[in-house]
UniProtKB/Swiss-Prot annotation:
Chain sites annotated for binding Mg(2+) 2: E192, E234, D236
Domain of life of the organism encoding this protein: Eukaryota
Name assigned to this protein: Decapping and exoribonuclease protein
Stretches for region Disordered: 1-37, 67-88
Cofactor names: Mg(2+)
Residue positions, PTM Phosphoserine: S394
Keywords, in A-Z order: Exonuclease, Hydrolase, Magnesium, Metal-binding, Nuclease, Nucleotide-binding, Nucleus, Phosphoprotein, RNA-binding
Amino acid sequence: MESRGTKREAGKIEVAEPRNKLPRPAPSLPTDPALYSGPFPFYRRPSELGCFSLDAQRQYHGDARALRYYSPPPTNGQSPNFDLRDGYPDRYQPRDEEVQERLDHLLRWLLEHRGQLEGGPGWLAGAIVTWRGHLTKLLTTPYERQEGWQLAASRFRGTLYLSEVETPAARVQRLTRPPLLRELMYMGYKFEQYMCADKPGVSPDPSGEVNTNVAFCSVLRSRLGNHPLLFSGEVDCTDPQAPSTQPPTCYVELKTSKEMHSPGQWKSFYRHKLLKWWAQSFLPGVPNVVAGFRNPEGFVCSLKTFPTMEMFEYVRNDRDGWNPSVCMNFCAAFLSFAQNTAVQDDPRLVYLFSWEPGGPVTVSEHRDAPHAFLPPWYVEAVTQDLPSPPKTPSPKD
């Protein structure tokens, strides 16, 4: 009788693999806030490299034509009384969310300007390129309890590109968005229309169409820990009266929120909404968030300015509050995790990082469609070292 684990064949004995040998576990990254409570990491003050605009048809323009100018109402103690429901839905042109733009617009800008980057192609080869919104999700992850995310990563010519992937749950949520939520989204854009003018020194004109295809985007350079960053984010407006007219310190972020009536409501606001506002504005160096508080009828009854660098003070003594150090340390840890995981230089290979609340960040590998996100026109231009796309790129390419 043969003993278990061996096989006799022509006088040759082969030793079988031990049955208790386990495959090496896939790498993962924990997200528990307690693991990231160390000192605040180094974060270089963001500097603006350039900008671009998207027009009413969502077409790219390498200039500031879509930039708007902050023009708040007079501070005479009266309620602004902005009707945020005005124009809905007849003067509303929402962006087609079925079009997955990925990094395309930012890559278009990068092709046009990569030769002008300080440090040249060598700097870009060690950098991480992404949208500001993707970094915002990373910052808030240790405190997020409801929504997961997926980030696709590809390495090409040394540069690591990060692009968000819509999760199945997020897609279902988007396609079944209730009418009230769609109206609340409109209200946020309508508030911007009341607070911004097309030219400095001119009053806002809220009678026009709200078209969410239009966007002005700033392109910024920074560094978190030892990770060089090049990222872009949409900017609501610039303040002509700001102490410094140098971007990004002249930019203003505009937000809306429901009116608060109790200390408990304010505490919840500081714990949850203010965290996201801080993360979104701290990353690009936007100094102020101006919030319009609306009543149940949809009218803005008050305005309040939240300086970005003072937001943490609202939760500093709250045991269940958030900590900027935790947010930034986790983001730095994720970037290290991504850099160490996405090691193969191949624009068609995607490392998909996935996270659900309560669990760690996990990773899986995929090749080509539907996960590959670096468009052929970009890969071709970079490979051939062309200064611009070989053809006019479209988000659908």
